[in-house]
């Protein structure tokens, strides 16, 4: 174990480490409290906020490749990093092809009842991610929710028609679960992507609205 690695983690120990004279810069991720503590430590700090990254699959896209890359990203460390995709926005003309390709590559679409069950276990009453299911497999999430998930499933997908508290999968999910949207045309898809970014993660990957158009 390197000498620079803390083997016992406590709030007090983390606070002392951030204020230590030999620490030149803090890269803080893990939530707003952690970022606030880093900014208040007196040491130069860079804070990382939640990422709510959407992936738009446009009608001329190579669908198998797009789906493969999304799944590879979402299943890396079971989506414990905030840079992984959180939502898929499919262009209407290729929606069916996208759905079929996800299933072919290990996607498991949840029906409305299953989606409600999964939402109830991966989020708490305040709408925050349940820490016990961060970075857990689709099978473990399914077991916790009382939803049968086969061994072939690599990611879970839930259809959503909007963004906000009434649509729980529209926020960051640090586990292999994706929201699925369908929009007709890149303009509508762009608006949906902006809506997702503005709901949670605004400024994380996008600062200038004009830059995407």
Predicted stretch roles:
Residues 26-38:
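Glycine-rich phosphate-binding loop
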Residues 3, 26-27, 51, 91, ...:
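Buried hydrophobic positions in well-ordered alpha/beta secondary-structure cores of metabolic enzymes
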Residues 35-164, 189-193:
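ALDH superfamily catalytic-core signature
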Residues 12-15, 34:
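Short acidic active-site motifs
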Residues 2-13:
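Glycine-rich oxoanion-binding loops at beta->alpha junctions
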Residues 16-25, 198-204:
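Short, surface-exposed connector motifs at secondary-structure boundaries
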Residues 27, 56, 89, 178-180, ...:
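Structural motif
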Residues 147-213:
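Conserved C-terminal structural/oligomerization subdomain of aldehyde/semialdehyde dehydrogenase
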